[in-house]
């Protein structure tokens, strides 16, 4: 595998300023293509209004070779909710730890303004019956502490199993944001479970999280020792392995498919071939995904969505290596027909467990297969400028893959490419 050029998060400010000062003032790369016309893929964080969820169509249509790659958030959210509900039904006789007739759960919310986080919160509440309508949609707001069931953003639900009725209650939920402003924060989730268990630990029967990073933090801090099932999302390697130790389950968002699509749409644009090549239509090497099984495509949204799979005690051994390339799209491209090209790609938070431990290793496996030389830029998870300051000379690159800190901030990147 060729040596990867990975740029550190703590790059010196003087270097960043130097890059800006020496950067192209709007010209293209040596290929003669203007920066604004180069292939661009948004991934993992879809350009959208963080308050309303409305897609940023301007960003998604930045040029003719712009796409988004992610996963089907609603389908995955529904799967997670169903997974939790199925577990409760199968274990109703033993899951009520204190025998009070109330099956209480706590929920770690990643980012109240992130579409995926919103969908997952809604999916769990809808499946468990604790959802409350707010302006025509399920309220995804944090409930705070709700031990007495008086919160307005959720409601108590009733579940009958084998003739016995149980109350299902969201005991507490909060956004896991740290003091520096970083969301989806695992350490904050670990602290939260400590606070919750100190106050009402005997009432917590299930732990649910918007992702595995936060879920594993709560599992390791408390749930594992107390044999409380914990459910996450992402199918990170440590979470999948933890299923053997009592972790309830997780959702694979088919990161192997997402990583492939992230680079494949760029490769196709750079080669001047149909965007579906090697995706829904086999390429010369035989790479091909199955639409409706592995992914779906929305032409209106210019978006590719990988489809999700529930990972539980029944099938977790099939998901133990989260960085393995997908067999269907594992064949090397011919370098004479797909010559090496240079790609600028950022990861919004270098400390994010899923992105750094699963997604980036997959990208690094696929960039070799697709003959792409990728510069990986690690962000701090807090500010766009920490990333954009290192896009000082876009003229050096043939294509771009962007993972924003906030979904609202696409213009922070396109304004640079438009110069």
What residues fall within each predicted segment?
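A residue-level marker of the well-folded mature domains of exported/periplasmic proteins
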Residues: 23-419
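C-terminal motif of bacterial Sec signal peptides marking the signal peptidase cleavage site
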Residues: 18-21
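Bacterial Sec-dependent N-terminal signal peptides
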Residues: 1-10
């Amino acid at each position: 595998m060729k040596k990867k050029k990975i740029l550190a998060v703590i790059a010196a400010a003087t270097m960043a300023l130097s890059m800006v000062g020496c950067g192209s003032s709007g010209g293209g790369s040596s290929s003669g293509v203007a920066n604004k016309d180069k292939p661009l893929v948004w991934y993992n964080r879809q350009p959208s209004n963080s308050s309303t969820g409305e897609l940023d169509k301007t960003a998604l249509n930045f040029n003719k070779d712009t796409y988004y790659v992610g996963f089907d958030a609603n389908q995955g959210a529904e799967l997670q909710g169903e997974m939790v509900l199925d577990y409760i039904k199968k274990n109703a006789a033993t899951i009520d730890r204190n025998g009070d007739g109330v099956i209480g759960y706590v929920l770690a919310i990643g980012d109240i303004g992130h579409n995926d986080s919103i969908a997952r919160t809604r999916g769990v509440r809808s499946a468990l019956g604790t959802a409350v309508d707010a302006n025509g949609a399920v309220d995804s707001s944090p409930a705070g502490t709700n031990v007495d069931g008086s919160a307005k953003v959720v409601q108590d639900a009733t579940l009958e199993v084998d003739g016995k009725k149980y109350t299902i209650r969201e005991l507490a939920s909060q956004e896991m944001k740290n003091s520096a402003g970083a969301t989806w924060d695992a350490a904050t989730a670990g602290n939260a479970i400590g606070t919750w268990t100190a106050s009402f630990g005997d009432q917590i029967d299930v732990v649910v999280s918007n992702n595995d990073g936060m879920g594993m933090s709560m599992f390791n801090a408390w749930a594992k020792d107390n044999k409380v099932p914990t459910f996450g999302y992402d199918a990170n390697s440590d979470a999948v392995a933890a299923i053997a130790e009592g972790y309830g389950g997780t959702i694979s968002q088919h990161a192997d498919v997402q990583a492939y699509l992230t680079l494949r749409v760029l490769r196709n644009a750079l080669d001047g071939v149909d965007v579906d090549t090697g995706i829904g239509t086999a390429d010369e090497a035989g790479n091909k995904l199955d639409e409706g099984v592995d992914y779906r495509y929305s032409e209106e949204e210019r978006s590719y969505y990988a489809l999700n799979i529930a990972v539980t005690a029944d099938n977790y051994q099939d998901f133990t290596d989260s960085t393995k390339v997908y067999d269907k799209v594992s064949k090397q491209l011919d370098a004479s027909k797909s010559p090496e090209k240079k790609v600028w790609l950022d990861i919004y938070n270098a400390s994010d467990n899923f992105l750094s431990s699963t997604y980036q290793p997959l990208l690094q496996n696929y960039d070799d297969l697709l003959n792409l030389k990728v510069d990986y830029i690690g962000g701090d998870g807090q500010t766009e400028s920490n990333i954009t300051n290192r896009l000082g000379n876009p003229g050096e690159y043939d294509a771009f893959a962007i993972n924003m800190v906030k979904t609202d901030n696409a213009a922070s990147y396109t304004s640079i490419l438009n110069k």
